[in-house]
Amino acid sequence: IQKACELGLQHSTHLYCAMSGVIKNGPQREGGVIESTLLMDHLTTEVIADGQHLPAELLKLAVKCKGFDRLAVVTDAQRGAGMPDGIYAFGSKNGTKSIVKNGVATTPDNTGYASSTIQMNQAIRVMRDLADVPLVEAIKMASLVPARIIGVDDQLGSLEVGKIADLVLFNQTIDVHK
């Protein structure tokens, strides 16, 4: 990871998902992608906050290591998001088959998740309820932080004069008003 950082790496996606942890090299051990991402202050990262991919402890560890300003909340939602149980494609245009049951998308053999089916308001709720993140910080992690990561925070991500005002209204339980 250090070499990648020297070449310009600034962000890692989907913290903990398909990432190496501690690597054993003979009698020695070295940190993998997970440990590097958590320890390197200049790296930003994101968590799939669906309440399935990561337990509360891993969400809390990510928040503790990265803070509210370097950790983005993503849904990683696929085509089955907000849809009834069934078979949906995920990934590329033609996609790979996934099974959505009780709101959870898995591979057909049920050995892994196939993206997620949550919407952003649900991800914010997960961060508040499972990771004990204050609501205002969870909203920032779903708006300003991602905008900053992709370099559009001068236009999006917060309510400020001169920025695009994308507003979503929700109630106390973070259900979106239509």
Q: Where do the language-model regions lie?
A:
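Histidine/acidic-residue-rich, glycine-tolerant segments that coordinate divalent metal ions
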Residues: 1-31, 82
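Short, Lys/Arg- and Gly-enriched loop/turn segments at beta-strand edges
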Residues: 174-178
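Catalytic cores of alpha/beta
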Residues: 1-3, 56-62
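His/Asp/Glu-enriched, well-ordered alpha-helical/loop segment
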Residues: 29-51, 63-75, 80-170
